[in-house]
Curated annotation (Swiss-Prot):
Taxonomic lineage: Eukaryota, Metazoa, Chordata, Craniata, Vertebrata
Segments carrying motif SVSE motif: 348-351
Domain remark from Swiss-Prot or TrEMBL: Despite low primary sequence conservation between eukaryotic catalytic subunits and bacterial and archaeal single subunit OSTs (ssOST), structural comparison revealed several common motifs at spatially equivalent positions, like the DXD motif 1 on the external loop 1 and the DXD motif 2 on the external loop 2 involved in binding of the metal ion cofactor and the carboxamide group of the acceptor asparagine, the conserved Glu residue of the TIXE/SVSE motif on the external loop 5 involved in catalysis, as well as the WWDYG and the DK/MI motifs in the globular domain that define the binding pocket for the +2 Ser/Thr of the acceptor sequon.
Any one of the GO CC terms: oligosaccharyltransferase complex
This protein's name: Dolichyl-diphosphooligosaccharide--protein glycosyltransferase subunit STT3A
Catalytic activity: a di-trans,poly-cis-dolichyl diphosphooligosaccharide + L-asparaginyl-[protein] = N(4)-(oligosaccharide-(1->4)-N-acetyl-beta-D-glucosaminyl-(1->4)-N-acetyl-beta-D-glucosaminyl)-L-asparaginyl-[protein] + a di-trans,poly-cis-dolichyl diphosphate + H(+)
Residues that hold dolichyl diphosphooligosaccharide according to the record: R405, Y530
The EC number(s) this enzyme carries: 2.4.99.18
Amino acid sequence: MTKLGFLRLSYEKQDTLLKLLILSMAAVLSFSTRLFAVLRFESVIHEFDPYFNYRTTRFLAEEGFYKFHNWFDDRAWYPLGRIIGGTIYPGLMITSAAIYHVLHFFHITIDIRNVCVFLAPLFSSFTTIVTYHLTKELKDAGAGLLAAAMIAVVPGYISRSVAGSYDNEGIAIFCMLLTYYMWIKAVKTGSIYWAAKCALAYFYMVSSWGGYVFLINLIPLHVLVLMLTGRFSHRIYVAYCTVYCLGTILSMQISFVGFQPVLSSEHMAAFGVFGLCQIHAFVDYLRSKLNPQQFEVLFRSVISLVGFVLLTIGALLMLTGKISPWTGRFYSLLDPSYAKNNIPIIASVSEHQPTTWSSYYFDLQLLVFMFPVGLYYCFSNLSDARIFIIMYGVTSMYFSAVMVRLMLVLAPVMCILSGIGVSQVLSTYMKNLDISRQDKKSKKQQDSTYPIKNEVASGMILVMAFFLITYTFHSTWVTSEAYSSPSIVLSARGGDGSRIIFDDFREAYYWLRHNTPEDAKVMSWWDYGYQITAMANRTILVDNNTWNNTHISRVGQAMASTEEKAYEIMRELDVSYVLVIFGGLTGYSSDDINKFLWMVRIGGSTDTGKHIKEHDYYTPTGEFRVDREGSPVLLNCLMYKMCYYRFGQVYTEAKRPLGYDRVRNAEIGNKDFELDVLEEAYTTEHWLVRIYKVKDLDNRGLSRT
């Protein structure tokens, strides 16, 4: 007996050790696969928004939380400025600053920039661990390990968590899955302890990302479905009431959120379900005290009265403005055409565009096919927790189709349900595999179809193993080629296969920092505002915060106008330098000419820009062209002239004419012109960034020198 007990304990230890080893390998893989950019380039911040996050984190680490919370940034949105503490989700910055100070406390000296660069890969490892525990609650440890391995390399999540991608989503996905895990534990146990931990995880989520609104609507929806399916119980009541009350109070401590949880339409579903919980509990109490006839009469009366009162109060609050309406971004989730028709500034952001079919396969690959299998398993074995994951999967699938950015929210549930699906398929077919010769003989005697079953099972397991291997290779390739290139440092392959580096952005920002006055104001399109402020340390007019559409529209009007009209706007805004991005020489397609129509649309969306009409920039046949057939309005606007100044004297390709644009594949139509109100200040090595100085009026204000 003692020997058998020892063997059993030893097996359990081996099982635990094996699980720990696999999970640790998945976590290490999750971290290491996100380091391509650091190995290929250097430790550098990516994209645009991360530069603002890095700048604010550096300020927090150096100056402390009090100054950070009360920081008024006079470098942004000139002449308006921006209050930082009350307009951001501080969770990301506080997390990085805390890690930075803890490491320095133990005399591990690391620059705050490197903390920011490696934070997202670190939290992706934590996400792997949370995914394991969450999936384990839904099925078993095997499914959890598969889901953890899948989320470690899934491109849909890697796209926002590579080293250098210092954005809110880098830690928010971990916070979201942690909240879901705590919620499922609270639902299963009905424990205030787990519900309180869920509320704390939700608070961390709120402090980190505006996407918390998805979470605070999904959990109430789960409770509502449990009510409708007759699964509502004391456990659900305790869990939801604790999470809602404590979570709402905690979330209101974030300055940027404030009273929104009790005043905005996005949060009213959670409040409504909280009220329904009280009504449901009260009805259950009445049912226990009254006979069926009395209860039915009272129930109908109470429901009718409560429904009428709630609708009346809700309508009055909406009409009086006490409850704010849905914001443009949320309207665009329900109606994908809303932003395009009403708010061009939202529609102009590439990550707000609808998702293409190819993006699903590109970002998810095998998961697209295994997701329905996991969904089927959950439907076949319904429980409170599985109903939640079904709803998470279905709702995130819809929202990801509306907005490509929300592929990030879909990727984790794809991994969870695919892990469940693969685990179920493998466990089903592995039951038919023979383990020993004795088992094989007995099975042959009992089942004449055994050999066929054995071969089919072996084939299915091999096929599944092949698909999992191809998923790994695909994910690694996508990570390396598509998601590990920092936008601030570009690269291309030369004719001999060598890598060519285009470091024009940092070159331009370095020039601005050292060759312009400290108080110089730089006008550019809003995409580059955060980078200019963080790297050049110069005042900008607009940036990626896009909180003031009128101000952005004014910049768009300047870009879309003639030099004379643009000069009036630039003098009005006290502009010293103008910066544009031009890819005609190198073939960089994300330049300002390709973004120009959005400048026209946004510029013409306000009263001061009513004279700017989009159709004026097209040819009579409705084409947007930069060659001789192009619209005269386009060929003479400020943006065109700044991009193509002196370009008509340049050869870009062999056997092509002077001034051949490699992005638009056309010879430019307006070559021989001079600038009247601007003078070229600096053009980078590959012409990617061009900086112009605004000429001053003479003393009498009559002519420019």
